[in-house]
Amino acid sequence: MHSKPQWLRAKAPTGEVFNETLNIVKLHNLHTVCEEAACPNIGECWNKRHATVMILGSVCTRACAFCNVATGIPDKLDPHEPENLAKAIKKLNLKHVVITSVDRDDLPDGGANQFIQCIEEIRKITSETTIEILTPDFLNKKGAFEAIAVASPDVYNHNIETVPRLYAKIRPRARYFHSLYLLKMVKQINPKVFTKSGLMVGLGETKEEIFQVMDDLRSAEVDFITIGQYLQPTPKHAKLDRYVTPEEFEHYKYIAYSKGFLVVASSPLTRSSYHAEEDFNRLKACR
């Protein structure tokens, strides 16, 4: 595995606020993608009381080659999860929350109803908190993402992850054009919802392929794109091709804005929910 360049070295997670956030998460039996996916930004985000909550358990039914989340046979759904989540958000005094999940291909609706219950429960307890969701593709789960769109999260995020050529290797159980269809339909069903998608680089894609993904996302009327460096979690995961330089990320940002995205986050440490509250405020200012 390649040694990390200086620009990818994040501070170790420490501090009083970090520990308070950790304690609240554990107290309410919540999982976070920050921990499960070993996010490099956990120290910075948790010290700001920003955490991305992962619902539907901590075990995924897929095994994408880039992802560090555990795979296998998941536990049954926790019926108290939506209420526990809402209570934790109130205790953390979050102005903006990001909710994601593992894939649950074992469930008839892929877990869509749990997303909806979380949205409803949060709005019962704290109506001022804006809600961003990051969902799986709900492949072959008819009506699943459509129902979530009707529930009106403030932001609907679904990550395209990589270029079409690399799907068979990186996301073997996903379909590129289905993900585009999901994003396009969410916007058609509920035009008030901001749509967002993310892309990893450093997996062997070309610049031309990245520009084509940008065009495809704009054709689906996606408002916001995130572009970040792929970091290989373990030697068993998809091999890192190279580290993309900060200057290249700036170039991608320039190109993405020129193609019509309302907001672009593009840097080595950019992740789907990194600076999500600040970026949501930027989105609102564009409308």
Swiss-Prot record:
InterPro entries membership: Aldolase_TIM (IPR013785), Elp3/MiaA/NifB-like_rSAM (IPR006638), LIAS_N (IPR031691), Lipoyl_synth (IPR003698), rSAM (IPR007197)
Annotated compartments: Cytoplasm
Record-linked Pfam families: LIAS_N, Radical_SAM
Pathway: Protein modification; protein lipoylation via endogenous pathway; protein N(6)-(lipoyl)lysine from octanoyl-[acyl-carrier-protein]: step 2/2
Disulphide-bridged cysteine pairs: none
GO cellular component, one term: cytoplasm
Residues involved in [4Fe-4S] cluster 1 binding: C34, C39, C45, S273
Leading EC class: transferase
Xref: CDD domains: Radical_SAM
Cofactor(s) for this UniProt protein: [4Fe-4S] cluster
Keywords linked to the UniProt accession: 4Fe-4S, Cytoplasm, Iron, Iron-sulfur, Metal-binding, S-adenosyl-L-methionine, Transferase
Catalysed reactions listed for this entry: [[Fe-S] cluster scaffold protein carrying a second [4Fe-4S](2+) cluster] + N(6)-octanoyl-L-lysyl-[protein] + 2 oxidized [2Fe-2S]-[ferredoxin] + 2 S-adenosyl-L-methionine + 4 H(+) = [[Fe-S] cluster scaffold protein] + N(6)-[(R)-dihydrolipoyl]-L-lysyl-[protein] + 4 Fe(3+) + 2 hydrogen sulfide + 2 5'-deoxyadenosine + 2 L-methionine + 2 reduced [2Fe-2S]-[ferredoxin]
Record-listed [4Fe-4S] cluster 2 binding positions: C60, C64, C67
Details of cofactor binding: Binds 2 [4Fe-4S] clusters per subunit. One cluster is coordinated with 3 cysteines and an exchangeable S-adenosyl-L-methionine.
One function term, GO molecular function aspect: metal ion binding
EC number(s) reported in the record: 2.8.1.8
Signal peptide range in chain numbering: none
Top-level taxon: Bacteria
Family: Belongs to the radical SAM superfamily. Lipoyl synthase family.
Protein name: Lipoyl synthase
Native organism: Wolbachia sp. subsp. Drosophila simulans (strain wRi)
